[in-house]
């Protein structure tokens, strides 16, 4: 899977990548692989972004930086972005991250995302999120690569509401997330935004054996 993703990026001459939250790319260690190939990849989920800056691994599937205190996060930001004044104010730190990431979304050559549900009936990719970074990763760059395990494929679009209801409640206790994205194609001729090209990488990595 890593080689497939790299070849897609290479053919598009993509050197900078923004990435939405994706546990499956953690599974295949995509960041390290692309970094060794000379491609800059930036996490855009705020928790993942903080963990990446600290050169650490996510400690939780939903809240990747839950192991870090407010002071530790403040120090990470101060060390990496001296242009901003040191602060332990959570709202100010969030604003700083937003400013940094907005510029990266605008300039990135490609965006990589995970997938929560992939609908076989329509070819639709469903992405669940609260921060809006997933939407930016999948619409702002000219190239979008979605990476997902084969267990995320569902047969019909009508299957999604029930699964979405279970997902949000079990993950964060919410009735529904702030953003629910449905992507069925790259940008069409009469559309003014969205990626010019789109690829879906399906990962097995032992899943078929577990199913058997």
Predicted stretch roles:
Residues 2-211:
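The feature marks the mature, well-folded catalytic cores of soluble enzymes
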């Amino acid at each position: 899977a890593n080689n497939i993703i790299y070849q897609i990026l290479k053919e598009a001459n993509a050197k900078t990548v923004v990435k939405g939250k994706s546990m499956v790319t953690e599974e295949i260690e995509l960041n390290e692989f692309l970094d060794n190939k000379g491609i800059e990849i930036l996490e855009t989920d705020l928790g993942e972004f903080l963990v990446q800056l600290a050169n650490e691994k996510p400690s939780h599937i939903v809240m990747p930086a839950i192991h870090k205190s407010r002071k530790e996060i403040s120090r990470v930001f101060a060390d990496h972005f001296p242009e901003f004044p040191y602060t332990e104010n959570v709202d100010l730190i969030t604003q700083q991250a937003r400013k940094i990431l907005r510029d990266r979304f605008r300039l990135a050559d490609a965006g990589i995302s995970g997938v929560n549900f992939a609908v076989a009936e329509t070819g639709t990719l469903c992405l669940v999120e609260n921060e809006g970074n997933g939407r930016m990763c999948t619409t702002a760059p000219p190239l979008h690569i979605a990476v997902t395990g084969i267990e995320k494929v569902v047969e019909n679009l009508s299957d999604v509401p029930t699964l979405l209801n279970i997902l949000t409640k079990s993950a964060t206790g919410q009735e529904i997330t702030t953003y629910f994205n449905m992507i069925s194609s790259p940008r069409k001729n009469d559309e003014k935004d969205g990626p010019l090209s789109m690829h879906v990488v399906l990962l097995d990595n032992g899943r078929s054996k577990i199913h058997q």
